[in-house]
Regions:
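Short His-centered aromatic/hydrophobic patch
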Residues: 87-92, 106
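A short helix->loop->beta-strand "cap" motif at the edges of active sites that frequently abuts
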Residues: 82, 99-102
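Short glycine-rich, flexible loops that bind phosphorylated cofactors or substrates
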Residues: 63, 93-94
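Alpha/beta-hydrolase
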Residues: 5-6, 106
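N-terminal strand-loop element at the rim of the active site
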Residues: 6-13, 20-64
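Extreme N-terminal starter segment of soluble prokaryotic enzymes
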Residues: 1-3
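Short, well-structured alpha-helical segments in soluble
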Residues: 70-81
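Short glycine-/acidic-enriched loop or helix-start segments at secondary-structure transitions
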Residues: 14-15, 45, 94-98
């Protein structure tokens, strides 16, 4: 299983959002994939059309950061088959407590 932790994911528009979307779509064709992404308006249409699981985290930016890290850390504890954690930025990995292999796309 691959875990994607990102602040940049559709339906929000942008280059990093497109990169994370394309990367996640490609990975999900070969591996079970779970995404933790920031809440975006009108996300339901996209989330319902993909073959991987997307968990959206909302709230104020500072609270969202800690809440997302907590949810990711809990998910990692419960799922021992995670092979790799992929993040869009070092800030997305900052509070993740795991010795699993990590890939960070710094932009």
């Amino acid at each position: 299983m691959y875990l994607v932790v990102t602040r940049s994911f559709p339906p929000e528009l942008g280059g990093m959002q497109n990169l994370m979307w394309g990367l996640t779509n490609s990975i999900s064709k070969y591996n079970l994939t779970k995404v933790f992404a920031d809440y975006q308006e009108k996300h339901k249409e996209i989330d319902d059309s993909v073959s991987f699981s997307i968990e959206r985290i909302g709230g104020a930016k500072l609270i969202r950061k800690y809440r997302k890290a907590y949810l990711v850390n809990e998910f990692i504890k419960k799922n021992k088959k995670i092979e790799c954690i992929i993040a869009d930025h070092w800030k997305s990995l900052e509070l993740i407590k795991s010795k699993k292999k990590k890939i960070c796309l710094i932009h």
